[in-house]
């Protein structure tokens, strides 16, 4: 009986085992699924991720959108692609999956410094510029591509010199003597400029505008932070992309000069020059200066990868010939990045970026104010009777101007045509990410950033007047800088119930080294050998070397808390220790706090269906600025004074002497900016309309100032100290709308920024004068003092031309019956009331149109060029505007007489407001079915026009210029500045 029961039990166990084996075998037999992923225009989506739900089993779609994957029976597939909504479907053979475009910007991932969050969870003031925004325009400068795209970001192109960097301000100017440039962070590496970076390599840009977001970067973030993420390799099918374009550039030409007869008549009235009769027009100086410039840009990239290994490689060439002859720029760029998942818990990244860029024809050609405004004003100032070359000596430029000191624009160009600056930059970064557990990760990165530069100048001893006086001059300067950054960051993310916590702590070490050597030479025999070994005299005072270094050690932390996506709070703290400061002032602490309330998640909002998201934000924080500090500013530094050892009566054994160059100041510290921000985010109508509003108030204190003490009052006269404060406050608004979403799509993005700047206080010196105008007037036109906006113009109030005398009447401000220096007052403000940008994009069946309009309102320009071209104070030629000058008593005109009482005054202050059609781009995506036979996945020819139309009352060549470039204390000065270009661009984008 027992045996029978045992046998029955064994038979049962065997049967059960057999069933389990059969079931396991059946389960292990995966099924092969094929399908296609398309978009809403029935075009294949290349590289879309197709993942078996709940597993890591996945593939990517090929060039035709097809995929093949083996999955378990009954599995579901999850399909995702950037810019489209994720979609989940049941796995079935031959399935066709259509992805819809992602219209909800709230799910966009935003970089916030050492981390990222979704746009909907941002508690601070952050603006975004996407690769799509850059892709619609043929740009070569990454910085210029942001113009008009983000509220609170004021970008102006100070001059049109090839390769010139734009001026960027985030919420106004914060420093009088330090840098006002934002901090750039490229793939986690902080840096001061991005000239080396090709716009085609950029994937996304985030602008941290308020202190509560930027404080995580501490003492370098007072001017805002621009975080740039570059394109990385993606798993899927290999993709090769080519973007090539060619541009034709012209200049806005609105300056006309007097002809020979008109010029002689003017000179007779002034009485300084006696010209002979019968002078004839010989030269149109515009033709000798301007040309049709061109830009050619070619960018090639390759990306490929698997779920374990991904890479991205790009390279390109940019070449520009400026609209002023002999000026040019060229850049070669290369970048490679690789990402490897070595283990499930270990990911390694490595990237190398190299750029080689060269500027030629820099110096006077850019209008540095020397030689009466340089090339541009010389076009008007040079008489038309003069030839280019001296008929009696054809190797020399003509300079017989009957005793008048005039240098023709052609000679001005020759003086700088051999000026060249060449730089190469290498940025190498290695990163490792260790995942201890899903909630806990550790990131370490080490980067090396090296820039090497060579600046050479040569002025031949024959063709130019100054060259003959100096017997030719040469210069060779070499500098090299290297920056090492080592970051270590620990992140912890945990969600439990309605609560989520994101904690981060880390450290950063930065070391910078710089060195320079330079040689000046002169006395060349001819122009055949421009190198210094052909110079017979090497300057004993203009030759030398220098070096410096600095370092920062930092620790930082951030804590983010989110309850039910309704209440959010963020706290940051960073401590920076800088070698630029004395030991007892070396460390600074920069805290910030921010919070947000998603009102739309409250119960009382549930019945309001047209509101998709409503969030109120607020934040406070502190940031620093140490850019105005030299590497050893707190120490007393000494100058080396060389003693001439050669020549009769000199000691051949003479040694140099030393003198103190500045006073030490161990109390120096960095500038500190405290900022408060309140904002509102609103998304309505099914995510089709998004509105952002922000109000901010930021105050900078302990501004870095320089003072020159009276002679003999101390061991040295120069002192750097902290003293003074400045305020910026304003409003920002941004609106994005999807106006049409059918076959015809129309999207609009608009932003506008209002900023008010005021220099609140100064210590020691209460007034700083800057920006001397013409040698004849010899007065400074900028006066910075408490209570006024930075860079305000200072001078006399012009009240029109006296009909009886022809002189300009100036206002007696003091009322003492006399017009004297005490009657000078504030006459203009270069800061705009507001700046704006408006982008409209249209697309229909592959045809795409993008229109960008941007502008500025309320800013004044001091037009020093007019002082040279309408001043009538010496023997230079003038513009045709002086034909309306006063000549006889009783004449009513707004142009004074020849040789009038010219002064810095409101007569030369003009409204610099403008509205500009910055870019119009039209492109066409050739249908896939027409190009697939050639192995292509994308073919997009395009045409674009840049700076096509400018509406302005400004009489100069362009209202966007600033002679003093990136200066914070001097703005809105036009003195022969290199004009901006109008461009027509033809290009093509190809992918295969």
Question: What are the functions of these language-model segments?
Answer:
Residues 13, 747, 829-857, 903-951, ...:
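Conserved C-terminal beta-signal and adjacent last beta-strands/turns
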Residues 41-43, 52-54, 71-72, 221, ...:
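A generic beta-sheet turn/junction motif
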Residues 1-335, 340-355, 364, 368-369, ...:
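Short, small/polar-rich motifs associated with maturation and membrane association
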Residues 154-157, 215, 600-607, 929-932:
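Active-site phosphate-binding and catalytic loops of NTP-dependent enzymes
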Residues 230, 259, 300-304, 334-340, ...:
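Residues on the lipid-exposed face of transmembrane beta-strands in outer-membrane beta-barrel proteins
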Residues 308-311, 345-348, 439-442, 498-501, ...:
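Repeated loop/turn-to-beta-strand initiation elements of outer-membrane beta-barrel proteins
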Residues 244, 315-321, 569-578, 620:
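Transmembrane beta-strand segments that form the barrel wall of outer-membrane beta-barrel proteins
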Residues 234-283, 323-327, 333, 337-425, ...:
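Surface-exposed loop/interface segments of Gram-negative outer-membrane beta-barrel transport/assembly proteins
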């Amino acid at each position: 009986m027992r045996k029978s029961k045992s046998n029955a039990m064994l038979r049962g166990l065997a049967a059960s085992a057999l069933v389990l084996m059969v079931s396991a075998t059946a389960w292990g037999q995966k099924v092969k699924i094929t399908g296609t992923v398309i978009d809403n225009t029935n075009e294949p989506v290349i590289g879309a991720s197709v993942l078996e739900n709940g597993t890591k089993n996945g593939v990517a779609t090929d060039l035709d959108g097809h995929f093949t994957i083996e999955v378990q029976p009954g599995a579901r597939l999850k399909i995702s692609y950037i810019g489209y909504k994720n979609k989940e479907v049941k796995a079935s053979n031959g399935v066709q999956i259509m992805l819809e475009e992602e219209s909800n910007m709230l799910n966009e991932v935003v970089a916030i410094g050492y981390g990222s969050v979704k746009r909907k969870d941002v508690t601070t003031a952050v603006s975004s510029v996407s690769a799509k925004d850059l892709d619609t325009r043929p740009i070569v400068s990454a910085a210029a591509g942001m113009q008009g795209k983000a509220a609170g970001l004021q970008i102006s192109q100070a001059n049109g010199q090839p390769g010139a960097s734009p001026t960027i301000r985030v919420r106004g100017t914060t420093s009088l003597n330090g840098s006002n440039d934002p901090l750039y962070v490229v793939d986690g590496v902080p840096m001061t400029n991005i000239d080396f970076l090709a716009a085609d390599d950029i994937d996304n840009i985030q602008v941290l505008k308020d202190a509560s977001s930027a404080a995580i970067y501490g003492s370098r973030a007072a001017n805002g932070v621009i975080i740039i993420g570059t394109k990385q390799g993606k798993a899927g099918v290999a993709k090769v992309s080519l973007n090539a374009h060619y541009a034709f550039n012209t200049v806005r030409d609105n300056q006309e000069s007097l002809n020979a007869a008109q010029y002689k008549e003017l000179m007779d009235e002034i009485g300084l020059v006696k010209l002979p009769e019968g002078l004839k027009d010989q030269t149109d100086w515009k033709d000798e200066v301007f040309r049709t410039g061109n830009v050619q840009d070619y960018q090639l990239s390759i990306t490929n990868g698997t779920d374990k290994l991904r890479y991205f490689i790009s390279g390109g060439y940019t070449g520009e010939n400026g609209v002023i002859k002999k000026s040019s720029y060229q850049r070669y760029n290369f970048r490679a990045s690789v990402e490897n998942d070595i283990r499930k818990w270990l990911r390694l990244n490595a990237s190398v970026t190299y750029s080689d860029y060269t500027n030629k024809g820099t110096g006077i050609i850019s209008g540095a104010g020397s030689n009466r405004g340089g090339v541009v004003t010389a076009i008007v100032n040079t008489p038309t009777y003069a030839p280019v070359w001296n008929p009696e000596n054809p190797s020399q430029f003509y300079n017989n101007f009957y005793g008048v000191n005039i240098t023709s624009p052609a000679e001005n160009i020759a003086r700088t045509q051999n000026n060249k600056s060449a730089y190469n930059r290498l940025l190498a970064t290695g990163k490792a990410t260790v995942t201890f557990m899903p909630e806990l990760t550790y990131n370490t990165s080490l980067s090396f950033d090296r820039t090497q530069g060579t600046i050479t100048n040569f002025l031949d001893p024959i063709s130019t007047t100054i060259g003959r006086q100096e017997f030719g001059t040469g210069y060779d300067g070499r500098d090299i800088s290297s920056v090492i950054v080592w970051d270590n960051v620990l992140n912890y993310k945990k969600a439990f119930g309605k609560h989520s916590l994101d904690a981060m702590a880390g450290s950063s070490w930065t070391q910078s080294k710089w060195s320079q050597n330079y040689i000046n030479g002169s006395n060349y025999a001819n122009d055949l050998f421009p190198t210094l070994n052909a110079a017979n005299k090497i300057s004993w005072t203009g030759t030398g070397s220098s070096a410096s270094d600095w370092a920062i050690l930092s620790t930082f932390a951030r804590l983010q808390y989110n309850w039910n996506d309704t209440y959010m709070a963020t706290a940051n703290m960073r401590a920076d220790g800088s070698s630029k400061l004395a030991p007892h002032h070396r460390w600074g602490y920069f805290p910030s706090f921010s919070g947000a309330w998603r009102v739309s998640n409250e119960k009382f909002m549930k019945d309001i269906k047209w509101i998709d998201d409503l969030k109120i934000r607020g934040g406070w924080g502190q940031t620093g600025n140490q850019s105005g500090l030299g590497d050893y500013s707190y120490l007393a530094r000494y100058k080396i004074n060389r003693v001439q050892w050669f020549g009769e009566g000199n000691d051949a054994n003479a040694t140099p002497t030393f003198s103190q160059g500045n006073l030490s100041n161990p109390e120096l510290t960095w500038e500190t900016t405290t900022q408060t921000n309140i904002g509102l985010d609103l998304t309505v109508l099914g995510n089709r309309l998004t509105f952002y509003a922000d109000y901010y108030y930021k105050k900078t204190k302990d501004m870095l100032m320089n003072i020159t003490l009276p002679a003999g009052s101390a061991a040295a006269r120069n002192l750097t100290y902290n003293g003074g404060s400045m305020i910026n406050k304003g409003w920002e608004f941004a609106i994005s709308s999807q106006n049409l979403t059918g076959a015809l799509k129309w999207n609009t993005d608009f932003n506008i920024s209002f900023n008010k700047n005021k220099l609140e206080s100064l210590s020691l010196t209460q007034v700083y004068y800057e920006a001397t105008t013409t040698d004849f007037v010899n007065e400074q036109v900028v006066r910075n003092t408490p209570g006024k906006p930075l860079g305000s113009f200072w001078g006399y109030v012009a009240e029109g031309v006296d009909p009886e005398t022809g002189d300009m009447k100036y206002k007696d401000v003091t009322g003492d019956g006399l017009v004297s220096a005490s009657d000078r007052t504030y006459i203009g403000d270069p800061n705009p009331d507001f700046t704006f940008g408006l982008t409209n994009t249209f697309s229909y069946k592959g045809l795409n149109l993008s229109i960008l309009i941007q502008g500025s309102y309320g800013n004044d320009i001091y037009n020093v060029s007019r002082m040279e071209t309408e001043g009538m104070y010496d023997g230079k030629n003038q513009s045709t505007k002086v034909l309306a000058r006063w000549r006889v008593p009783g004449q009513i005109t707004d142009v004074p007489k020849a040789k009038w009482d010219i002064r810095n005054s409101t007569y030369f202050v003009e409204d610099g407001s403008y509205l500009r059609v910055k870019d119009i781009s039209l492109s066409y995506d050739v249908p896939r079915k027409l190009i697939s036979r050639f192995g292509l996945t994308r073919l997009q020819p395009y045409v674009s026009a840049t700076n096509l139309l400018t509406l302005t009352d400004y009489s100069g060549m362009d209202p966007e210029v600033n002679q003093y470039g990136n200066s914070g204390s001097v703005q809105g000065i036009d003195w022969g500045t290199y004009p901006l270009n109008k461009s027509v661009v033809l290009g093509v984008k190809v992918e295969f």
